[in-house]
Amino acid sequence: METIFAQSSAFGKAGVAVFRISGPKSLEVLQLLTGRADFKPRIMYYQQITVPKTIVNSASFAYKEPRVEPITNRRATSDIVSEGGSIDYKELIDNAMVVYFKSPNSFTGEDVVEIHTHGSKAISIMLINALLNIADIRLAEAGEFTKRAFLNNKFDLTAAEGIADLINAETIMQHRQAIRQASGGLEELYNNWRTQLLKIISLLEAYIDFPDEDIPDSVLNDVNNTHKNLVNEISNYLNDNRRGELLNSGLKLAIIGPPNVGKSSLLNFLMQRDIAIVSNIAGTTRDIIEGHLDIGGYPIILQDTAGIREESSDIIEQEGIKRAIHSAKTADIKIIMFDAEKLDSSINEDIMNLINENTITIINKIDLIEPNKIFSIENKYKCLRVSVKNNIALSSILKNIENIAENMAGFTETPYITNQRHRHYLKQALSHLTAFSLDNDLVLATEDIRMTARCIGAITGVINIEEILGEIFKNFCIGK
């Protein structure tokens, strides 16, 4: 296995930059950079990181921009004068904290070195160039450290995906979902199903391969019961309304309604900045304006849309209305706004057909009508009564959005399907599982279960036929 390295922290100015090296030559590289040999595992050392003499004097070594000149007042004590009269020294890169992790007790399961330098672009460039000029070490590919950890059985594929989701998490709920997955929540669920499938296979293989053995007929009843339970569990699990995927990607919220009812003002309020033009002129918003928001820990993708009205002679506005209706139909949550002064005239069939259980109906500009009309609206329409301009009852909008988001993507005891890859293999697994029947040839029936187990194994990255043999010898005394 090759030795690889990369900067694990973001490139740029920061308090600390972290570099990771993994592979059989990790310790040797650390010794070369520091001139020290006696590194004990899992102990932090404060060391000078230098460009080795062989690299400084090599014609192949050249810094990329920005050019960093040698700092002569920081030469190592081993500086000597070469035969040509020039200075030959180890160039100091930085004073850093370093730590060595011995295989297999590391993130990747290999020998690993971490170097913690100051977060300087120049330091990063110098150290990366120094590492690139050392023999038998190369720059890591994207995700290669995590890939090596998976290959060394540090975690399964779902946990690896959980780590990626954790890095990309922007809200508390996304963090909670990612940390549960990275900690093995999905692995435990899928492995439990796979263990039951392997048990079924081992029982059926015993019937097929050892027909003369005294195997009780009740075993087939156990197979049927386990099969039935698995079909129900996986079917119910797939029927989750994409809760985990919604939490990962964000819930789309479309703000729709007739022209000039305050949709753009509401978008600006929710975003806490002016991203949409607000005007008294109807039809100001022509295209969809999008913003991202965290409400109650849930990622919300806001979309302000063109005002919907039945008649418009403007071709561009007509296209905007089409896009608004499409946005509403594909949205997870909808806010439909009306003007309190023009309520009866602004309600049209196109808008009313968009209302469902995940719709928040809002009557805006409530401050512009008489109190007796407010009571009339309360009796006629189930909605929120607000004034975006004067900040009246706007907190109720946020609370309603949070409640719907929680209902659609809130936590349950069972971990969610978090991406399409899992859903794809689970659908395949269920297809093979429902095809299974003991009325069929036992060899074919066993193959259906085997394919189901392989689909589950493809999710976690574990596919091993030897496990089936292990189950057979574990549960039966063959050839006693």
UniProtKB/Swiss-Prot annotation:
Which EC number(s) does UniProt give?
Answer: 3.6.-.-
Principal localization?
Answer: cytoplasm
> Top EC class per UniProt?
hydrolase
Q: Does the entry feature the keyword Metal-binding, yes or no?
A: yes
InterPro entries from the entry? G_TrmE, GTP-bd, GTP-bd_TrmE_N, GTPase_MnmE, Guanylate_kin-like_dom, MnmE_dom2, MnmE_helical, P-loop_NTPase
> Which Pfam families would you find in this protein's record?
MMR_HSR1, MnmE_helical, TrmE_N
Q: Does the keyword tRNA processing apply?
A: yes
Q: Which BP terms from GO are recorded? A: tRNA methylation; tRNA wobble uridine modification
Which cofactors does this protein require? K(+)
Q: Which parts of the sequence bind (6S)-5-formyl-5,6,7,8-tetrahydrofolate?
A: 20, 114, 154, 480
Binding-site residues for GTP, renumbered to this chain: 260-265, 279-285, 304-307
The record's comment on cofactor binding reads:
Binds 1 potassium ion per subunit.
- Which segment of the chain is annotated as a signal peptide? none
Q: Which GO terms describe its cellular component?
A: cytoplasm
Which positions are annotated as binding Mg(2+)? 264, 285
Q: Indicate which residues the UniProt annotation says bind K(+).
A: 260, 279, 281, 284
Segments forming domain TrmE-type G? 250-406
SUPFAM superfamilies per record: Folate-binding domain, P-loop containing nucleoside triphosphate hydrolases
Coiled-coil ranges per UniProt:
none
Q: Which family does it belong to?
A: Belongs to the TRAFAC class TrmE-Era-EngA-EngB-Septin-like GTPase superfamily. TrmE GTPase family.
What role does this protein play? Exhibits a very high intrinsic GTPase hydrolysis rate. Involved in the addition of a carboxymethylaminomethyl (cmnm) group at the wobble position (U34) of certain tRNAs, forming tRNA-cmnm(5)s(2)U34.
Q: Cite the PANTHER family for this sequence.
A: TRNA MODIFICATION GTPASE GTPBP3, TRNA MODIFICATION GTPASE GTPBP3, MITOCHONDRIAL
Subunit-structure text: Homodimer. Heterotetramer of two MnmE and two MnmG subunits.
Protein name (record): tRNA modification GTPase MnmE
The organism named in the record is Rickettsia felis (strain ATCC VR-1525 / URRWXCal2)
Q: Tell me the classification of the organism that encodes this protein.
A: Bacteria, Pseudomonadati, Pseudomonadota, Alphaproteobacteria, Rickettsiales
